[in-house]
Amino acid sequence: MGSIIQDVTLTPLRTISAPGGDVLHAMKRTDAGFTGFGEAYFSTILHHDIKDWRRHLRMTMNLVVPLGSIRFVLYDDRTDSTTHGAWMQICLSRDKNYQRLTVPFGIWMAFQGLAAPSSMLLNIADLPHEPDEAERRPLDFFKFDWKS
């Protein structure tokens, strides 16, 4: 369940300790995974909550967790992928695994808040939000044990 899905990348990020507060790198336009800029937004998730499955049709997401801890679960059902049918899960946090997760369009993803009271993610997307650009499914659409 921990293998990398084709075209999904993990990029270690730098934290710079500074008096009065640290600097957390997220992305530069010269970084791998940068495919353009559409919008950047923060999203919070409560401890133990899980956001439903979604798959973007054109958007590439670059996800960073600067606060708390989030488990991301990805499923590849792209028929032309070398990892068709593969699952991947990764927990990201500032303290234990500060990396950027790049998820291309066509990959199903859901995520769970692991830290109390809440966690925060930053999505640096190559497209602005469009309501019809993503497909959504309920959590029980794919058989995944969120308690494991």
Say what each PLM segment does:
Residues 1-97, 114-148:
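Non-catalytic, conserved peripheral segments adjacent to functional cores
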Residues 101, 109-114:
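Short beta-strand His + acidic residue motifs that chelate non-heme Fe in jelly-roll/DSBH
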